[in-house]
């Protein structure tokens, strides 16, 4: 989860987030190298006579600065397309959970079970227990089995929302009248926090998301107790 004055991304807890962090580092290195080269050339132009005012045509130079950026863009695009494909691909999910955005709370329905549905509201600051996080704790957590592919179906009852859990690499728009889907897979147990990431009204900041990833046996016991 996030912590004060954090500069980097949250620790990856899913295969998708691991790939996103690797892609971020890959792209950042390319940007750093290009920026360093440009600054070096600018410094040479300012401190030396690295100019040719009489040059009217430089076919070789124009070819280089056309082909080289194209190659760089391809090096950035290929891993990006790979991750997009991974995020859209859902193979044999063991569980499907439908989540609906409301002003200003989330509702969840486990479609593989009968009558397993609930609303999830933020816990007010005055009702927090020791150890619970302000503006992030909810009264009903979404309990899911870890290390298994889970399909999330996401929509909205009223306005645009966005269901996001950064440490799992998840951010999917909740659009009225449209059903979007995302894959949830966690490498480890724990609590994973997120929030609505689309400005949806005056209480937009009070729509937290809490996923509790547990071993399959614990999930089966929890689901049996909820039905």
Swiss-Prot record:
Catalysed reaction(s)?
4 Fe(II)-[cytochrome c] + O2 + 8 H(+)(in) = 4 Fe(III)-[cytochrome c] + 2 H2O + 4 H(+)(out)
Give cofactor(s), names only. Answer: Cu cation
Q: How does it sit in the membrane?
A: Multi-pass membrane protein
User: What Pfam families does this protein map onto?
Assistant: COX2 (PF00116), COX2_TM (PF02790)
Q: Which terms are listed as keywords in the entry?
A: Copper, Electron transport, Magnesium, Membrane, Metal-binding, Mitochondrion, Mitochondrion inner membrane, Respiratory chain, Translocase, Transmembrane, Transmembrane helix, Transport
One GO CC annotation: mitochondrial inner membrane
Return the cofactor note field. Answer: Binds a dinuclear copper A center per subunit.
The Swiss-Prot or TrEMBL record annotates one GO molecular function as: cytochrome-c oxidase activity
The UniProt record gives the binding positions of Mg(2+) as 198
In its UniProt record, which GO terms are filed under biological process? ATP synthesis coupled electron transport
Segments on the Mitochondrial matrix side according to the record's topology features: 46-59
- Which domain of life, per UniProt? Eukaryota
Q: Give the transmembrane region(s).
A: 15-45, 60-87
Q: Which family does it belong to?
A: Belongs to the cytochrome c oxidase subunit 2 family.
Q: What quaternary arrangement does the UniProt entry report?
A: Component of the cytochrome c oxidase (complex IV, CIV), a multisubunit enzyme composed of 14 subunits. The complex is composed of a catalytic core of 3 subunits MT-CO1, MT-CO2 and MT-CO3, encoded in the mitochondrial DNA, and 11 supernumerary subunits COX4I, COX5A, COX5B, COX6A, COX6B, COX6C, COX7A, COX7B, COX7C, COX8 and NDUFA4, which are encoded in the nuclear genome.
NCBIfam families, alphabetized: CoxB
**Full protein name:** Cytochrome c oxidase subunit 2
Q: Which organism is it from?
A: Hylomyscus parvus
Upper classification of the organism: Eukaryota, Metazoa, Chordata, Craniata, Vertebrata
